[in-house]
């Protein structure tokens, strides 16, 4: 009796991943791009997170993203793409790229979310953002201004816009898997579902299905 129960349990557990995968339907929970967008993760699979620092939903999703990162497969790169869907979002996108240019993303990413989405601080131009970086102790204001006006940051902004346009991103947060599949929170139903669908699609790419 115990043996048969154990066999039944093993069979059930084997069916769980397939059943979960069957729940995620193309056109309902995610969409496939007719023309894939460029990935920038080398030999790794790419999960791109399109976000805006002032977005309450993106802010709420961050703990879910952080938890996912703890068990992220080694062959997957999480790429951050700051949204510039509106003109007033552009300074915040540029803040991310300036931070990346200075090598201080890890020291300012959460703090920018706290300030813009959490506290609704008025950080809408280079002077305010440079002062904020200095306030957080991650860079001198002059360093931020230099990075802000650099060719590298301008190029990153242009590529980010091209990525968003190519993926037909209309809101945040949005996930783009391997430049091919687009997942919105509205379609997925929750932040946790977004990442579950992303994991399903990453496995699909990994297996070549």
Q: What is the meaning of each model-derived region?
A:
Residues 135-209:
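C-terminal cap of thioredoxin/glutaredoxin-like
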Residues 2-87, 161, 166, 202-209:
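Extracytoplasmic thiol/disulfide redox context detector
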Residues 43-44, 54-61, 85-92, 101-105, ...:
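Solvent-exposed, acidic/flexible segments
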Residues 62-69, 92-96, 109, 126, ...:
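Extracytoplasmic/secreted envelope proteins and their assembly/folding machinery
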Residues 45-46, 73-76, 107-111, 138-141, ...:
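A short alpha-helix capping/helix-coil boundary motif
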Residues 52, 82-83, 116-117, 147-148, ...:
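Short, contiguous strand/loop micro-motifs
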Residues 54, 69-72, 99-103, 112, ...:
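Sec/Tat-exported extracytoplasmic proteins
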Residues 73-102, 107-133:
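Structural microenvironment flanking redox-active thiols in thiol-disulfide oxidoreductases
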